[in-house]
């Protein structure tokens, strides 16, 4: 059988930082293999950067680089546009312009998708071309394509995952080496995992943007970052991690998107990011250091987990490269795989969310205290699953894991506990993956 004739596809790349440079290198290294397997010959024909005098470490002639991103998008010889510049503007306008010209777009920009995803999805559908973004949520982990395609007809109930490598590295160091939060963060910064200002990572904003994208795709719902409840890891202590360990759990920062039913019977979506106690026998408990994983639960498929490197120039570029090949192939075949408009679905307020909880309280160690504490739990419909007492002389620390309870009921329980004379202080309160 003769070899198929290759179709030339000229690519314009917007941005050439770590991911962009790694992508250009991958195209150079793998173009021969791609051509043999798919019949598509990829060529990076233009790269838009802020400063053309900076050495990007890629094998490209100087005339490929330009500071005019609009010219790259509008160039009629450019077939596919790859956006890896980051930020919302001018990335949004450039992506919309490319789509309006009938050019498929590949992006790794989670902030853009989280804030303006539906606008871009509708534009891509109207143009009949691809908008692909596998790299936007979990680096090299292929989760977007399964949600868009393989699981499109699956009645998904929950998608949750470790989608921020920085916080997972910090929590792993605290767990495995007993490092304090401050020391683990400093090490992450020294290794380049954390920015000098780590707020977006450690306070859950980065994971929140990714959770919005995941929820939108998993449930076809209109979800933006403002809909996502988030707590970070800056308040997690080594003592919390050790207490969790004694109760058979580790602590992970999880992004959770789940479909449920409101008290009045309407479908609702809960989307949140927070530190979570994960049982040691759960697959997510084995995801350590800077690795990411996404755990999917569905009515028919059961449970699936996608695992891999969630950050880094080359792993992320690998996902972009895969999208680029798909976009080029669909362009040759004359069709795209648009997402289109999203549905209005009620976003559950955090008070309505049900979860299991871990909490610790310091109490006077005297008769009758435990029964008083248990009465407060019961009075607010919060059922205790397990309890551990650690003696501290005249004081004792009580550690509880509850069964599923409504967040609002848990908050009322905390207020009730705070009113007991025997309760000296309320310590950590963390959610638990539980029944």
Model-derived regions, located:
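N-terminal glycine-/serine-/threonine-rich beta1-alpha1-beta2 phosphate-ribose binding loop
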Residues: 1-101
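Short, ordered loop/turn segments at secondary-structure junctions
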Residues: 50-52, 86, 110-112, 118, ...
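Rossmann-fold NAD(P)-binding glycine/threonine-rich loop
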Residues: 90-101, 110-148
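A short hydrophobic/small-residue beta-strand
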Residues: 105-106, 384
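Rossmann-like NAD(P)H-binding beta-loop-alpha module
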Residues: 125-206, 213
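Substrate-binding/catalytic subdomain of NAD(P)-dependent oxidoreductase enzymes
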Residues: 183-286, 291-293
